[in-house]
Amino acid sequence: WYYQDYSVENQIHYINTIRSADWVYCHNVSDISYYKGLGCKDVRVMRSMMIPEGLDCQDGSLYKEGILLGGNFVSWYGGMDSYLVASDIPEKKYGVSMGRKQEQEESIEDIEYLPYLTWREWMKNIGQYKFGVHLMRTHAAGTFSMNLSFHGTPVIGYYGLDTQELLHPNTTVAVGDLRTAKFLMRKLYEDESFYKECSEETLHLFQKHYSEEAWMKDWKIRNG
C-alpha cells in the first residue's frame, strides 16, 4: 500500500491505471482480494524467484551465529518490531542498509549494520547468520525470507507473504503478534531440535516451492 503515501491526485491516477490493465500480477495470494477490491479484472500471482547458479548453500548450523534483521526502522519494514523480538535472546544483531535507513540507526549500539551489497555479495554473506527476523507488516516480494531459506536459516515473520508462509510455516505469526514471535525466538535459541527441524524443513520447502523448476510449474498453472 505504499502508493497511499503519494499525493491524492497520484493515488487516484495509480488506481485508474491498474484498473485499466488487462491483468495484474502480484506477489502474494493474499494480494489478490485487495487488487480485485480495487476493481482490477484479472489478478494473478507471479511468485518471487531467485536463480542460485554459482552460489553455495550454507546450511550447517554449527558454525552459524547472530541474528539478521530484515529491514530498517520505518513503518514499511517494521524494523522496531524485529529489533524488539531479536533482543529477547543473547545473540549479536546485524542490520541491513536499505534506501529508507535513518541516520539515527547507526547510534543503536547493539546492531552492526552491513554495507550496501550487490545481490550476489548479499547471498554469499547472509549464510553465516543463524536466525532471521523480518516482521514487515506490508506485503511485498518477500525476498528476505526466500534468500535465507536457501541457506536453511529459519526466519520469524508475519502472515501475508507467500515466501514466509510457504518456506517458514513454523515461525510465521499473525501481524502484530510480538508475544508469539518472542516465544519462537527463544524456542529457536534454546531448543536445538526445533531449530534443526525448522532449518531442514525450509531447505526442503525452498526446493519444493521456489526452485526454477517449481517456479515454472506454478507459472504454467496460473497462466494456462
Language-model features and meaning:
Residues 190-223:
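A charged, aromatic-enriched C-terminal amphipathic alpha-helix characteristic of glycosyltransferases
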Residues 111-126, 139-141:
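Conserved active-site histidine-acidic residue motif and adjacent donor-binding/catalytic loop
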Residues 169-179, 187-192:
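Conserved acidic donor-binding segment of nucleotide-sugar-dependent glycosyltransferases
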Residues 123, 145-151, 164:
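Short alpha-helical segment that forms part of, or immediately flanks, the ligand-binding pocket
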Residues 127-140, 153:
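Acidic donor-binding loop of glycosyltransferase active sites
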